[in-house]
């Protein structure tokens, strides 16, 4: 039956049913008929609600899924399928906003047109018997009852069927189909009887004669009689069964299930080698901004105009020179490229009208930096089919790198607060459904905690840079276009601010496929001296380009200003994902919501307000060598956001592989902590799969280090 349910119903419905059974302490492996009944009831509730909307005139209308009008208000609020706490929160909110009488039991739906709660019943018995049982239980004339059966019958309060005939016919057809599918698999009789709690034939009668002989003949191979088979099933040990099955599959497979104990797991081995280097597409904690407040200049909002205005705010330019060369690059070319940018920006300022975009002259230094004419010539395969020694290039294995402290510092910095506001509260219309009040409250609290966060700045910076680069790649394919790296924010006082981080020069960009690469040179301002952590800046040539006066406790101090220059590349698909970094905010909000839900279900009321306003309470943030780190709810929000943002900034195959494989080990460890006595086979193979993803990526190496801290403290 369980297999049938998983095949027959939408995975979302199955998941909700699993959650409901778990909430009431029922085992779906044992109560399989109940599992099927819950899924059926959920599906009927969803079908009841589907396609029914209320238009601006307050009339009920039916709208198909692909109709643009689907943004209308839903006619029905679905209460069934939510966890108890959230369901009661929705019911209370509906009662408060509509004046409806609060029901004693949780109903399934609320009808905004008829202004009444609805109890949906799905029965395998006579509809009128089930209707009377429901009515006696509810004892309220205010809640409307609507019963469906698997035979196509229905019954509703005062014969008011709420929906049109076609909508009800869809539900009846679906129930009839489920019944037929169950019957074809021999599941229907057991399912039908289970609603009445009838005893099965085996319990009532001793099986004798022909039926007994048929039972003995219907057993799997190697069983001589029904008693033997029953004894086998009663003493069934799944672990041994899996071993046996695996050994039948292949002579090579010899899996012995080993118990997983506290002493079983070992730490993940991190690679040795030179320290890992920075590989993000733009500088993070080391970035420096040239900013203008309350921009009101001519052409404000046009990137090139904004960039020139920001450049004019700095007066400490000096003759640039290389302070940290790139080991494999032609460093004078990077120096000449920066001088060319300065010269061409000066030329623009001397013109009467500043152009909207700037294409750089194709000088030898830029051609070199952008890899112009460096790609090997492509030859049609048919022209070289007959070459006997045709072979692919031998590619070198990537060099193993060790974890370096800078990536933990980057992450810590991403969790910190800045002096600026990087996102506004969404201008979302008035809440329509009661559940939206809670959602809005949570969103507003969360936004207040993360709007000043440096990780949020990285989101807005990443979105801007990737959007500008993709636009330029499509609009000026052959040009070396100069793209300012800009972001917008507000000061704490609410004044608008435009920031310039540096410039990008893009190369030729005839991007036919999603993975075709466009080369670019990035030039970014910074106050970080690269000589302090030279291994971090392996891929960069760093110039000293000026001196900046900074206010400090002892007055004004002069600090050298650096320019971090490197050749880089990206593709259409990477730029697309870079443009879509905003969902990182949503992902971390959902993680916080699940924490609130857990707390609310324990306290049996919505805990959103207490969660965010109780500043004295601390929450677990993560593992470190010292143990479980804790912090305020704001710190938790910002840490979750930073993790999501870094997953986007440092996305790579190594990260995908590590996340997927380490999750398996994590689940086994969690099962051990929950006293579920997990067993494993080929644990060495799992460690191998995890460790082959640890090559040179700083973010993956840091996650592996965190995982080891978790293992240490989880298994004490």
UniProtKB/Swiss-Prot annotation:
Give binding positions for Mn(2+) 1: 41, 108, 119-120
Annotated localization? Host cytoplasm; Host nucleus
What keywords does the record list, in alphabetical order? Answer: Cap snatching, Endonuclease, Eukaryotic host gene expression shutoff by virus, Eukaryotic host transcription shutoff by virus, Host cytoplasm, Host gene expression shutoff by virus, Host nucleus, Host-virus interaction, Hydrolase, Inhibition of host RNA polymerase II by virus, Manganese, Metal-binding, Nuclease, Phosphoprotein
Q: For this UniProt entry, what is the primary localization, expressed as one broad class?
A: host cell
> What are its E.C. numbers?
3.1.-.-
Entry's family note: Belongs to the influenza viruses PA family.
Q: What is this protein called?
A: Polymerase acidic protein
């Amino acid at each position: 039956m369980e297999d049938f349910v998983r095949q027959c119903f939408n995975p979302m419905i199955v998941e909700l049913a699993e959650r409901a059974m778990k909430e009431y302490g029922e085992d779906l492996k044992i109560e399989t008929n109940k599992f099927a009944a819950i899924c059926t009831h959920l599906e009927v509730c969803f079908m009841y609600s589907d396609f029914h909307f209320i238009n601006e005139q307050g009339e009920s209308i039916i709208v198909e899924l692909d109709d643009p009008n689907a943004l209308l208000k839903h006619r029905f609020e679905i209460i069934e399928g939510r966890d108890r706490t959230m369901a009661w929160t929705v019911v209370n909110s509906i009662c408060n906003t509509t004046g409806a009488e609060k029901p004693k039991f949780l109903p399934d739906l609320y009808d905004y047109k008829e202004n009444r709660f609805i109890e949906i019943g799905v029965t395998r018995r006579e509809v009128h018997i089930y209707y009377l049982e429901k009515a006696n239980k509810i004892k309220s004339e205010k809640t409307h009852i609507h019963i469906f059966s698997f035979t196509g019958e229905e019954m509703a309060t005062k014969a008011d069927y709420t929906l049109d005939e076609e909508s009800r016919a869809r539900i009846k057809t679906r129930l009839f189909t489920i019944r037929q599918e169950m019957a074809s698999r021999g599941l229907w009789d057991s399912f039908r009887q289970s609603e009445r709690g009838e005893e099965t034939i085996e319990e009532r009668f001793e099986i004798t004669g022909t039926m007994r002989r048929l039972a003995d003949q219907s057993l799997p191979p190697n069983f001589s009689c029904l008693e033997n088979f029953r004894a086998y099933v009663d003493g069934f040990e799944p672990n041994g069964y899996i071993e046996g099955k695996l050994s039948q599959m292949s002579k090579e497979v010899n899996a012995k299930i080993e118990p997983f104990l506290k002493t079983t797991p070992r730490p993940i081995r991190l690679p040795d080698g030179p320290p890992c280097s920075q590989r993000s597409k733009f500088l993070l904690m080391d970035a420096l901004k040239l900013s203008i407040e309350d921009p009101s200049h001519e052409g404000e909002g046009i990137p090139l105009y904004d960039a020139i205005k920001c450049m004019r705010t700095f007066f400490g330019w000096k003759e640039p020179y290389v302070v940290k060369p790139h080991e494999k690059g032609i460093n004078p070319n990077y120096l000449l490229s920066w001088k060319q940018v300065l010269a061409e920006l000066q030329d623009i300022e001397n013109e009467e009208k500043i152009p909207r975009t700037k294409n750089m002259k194709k000088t030898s230094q830029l051609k070199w930096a952008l890899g112009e004419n460096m790609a090997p010539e492509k030859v049609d395969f048919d022209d070289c089919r007959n070459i006997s020694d045709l072979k692919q290039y031998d590619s070198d294995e990537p060099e193993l790198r060790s974890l370096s402290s800078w990536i933990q510092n980057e992450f810590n910095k991403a969790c910190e607060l800045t002096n600026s506001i990087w996102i506004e509260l969404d201008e979302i219309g008035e809440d329509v459904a009661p559940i939206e009040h809670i959602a809005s409250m949570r969103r507003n609290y969360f936004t207040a905690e993360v709007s000043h966060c440096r990780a949020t700045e990285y989101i807005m910076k990443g979105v801007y840079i990737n959007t500008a680069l993709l636009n330029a790649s499509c609009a000026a394919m052959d040009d070396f276009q100069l793209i300012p790296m800009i972001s917008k924010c507000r000061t704490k006082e609410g004044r608008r601010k435009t920031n310039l981080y540096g410039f990008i020069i893009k190369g030729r960009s005839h991007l036919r496929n999603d993975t075709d690469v466009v080369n670019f040179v990035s030039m970014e301002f910074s106050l970080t001296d690269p000589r302090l952590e030279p291994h971090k800046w392996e891929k960069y040539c760093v110039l000293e380009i000026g001196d900046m006066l900074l206010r400090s406790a002892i007055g004004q101090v002069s600090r050298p200003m650096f320019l971090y220059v490197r050749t880089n590349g990206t593709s259409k698909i990477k730029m697309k994902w870079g443009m879509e970094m905003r969902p990182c905010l949503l992902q971390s909000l959902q993680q916080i919501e699940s924490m609130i839900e857990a707390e609310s279900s324990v306290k049996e009321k919505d805990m959103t307000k207490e969660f965010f306003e109780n500043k004295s309470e601390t929450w677990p943030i993560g593992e470190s060598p010292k143990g479980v780190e804790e912090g305020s709810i704001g710190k938790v929000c910002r840490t979750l956001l930073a993790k999501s943002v870094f997953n986007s900034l440092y996305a790579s195959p190594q990260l995908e592989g590590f996340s997927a494989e380490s999750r398996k080990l994590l689940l086994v460890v969690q099962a051990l902590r929950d006293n579920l006595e997990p067993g494993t086979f080929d644990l060495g193979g799992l460690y191998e799969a995890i460790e082959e993803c640890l090559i040179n990526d700083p973010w993956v190496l840091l996650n592996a280090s965190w995982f080891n801290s978790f293992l240490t403290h989880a298994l004490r």
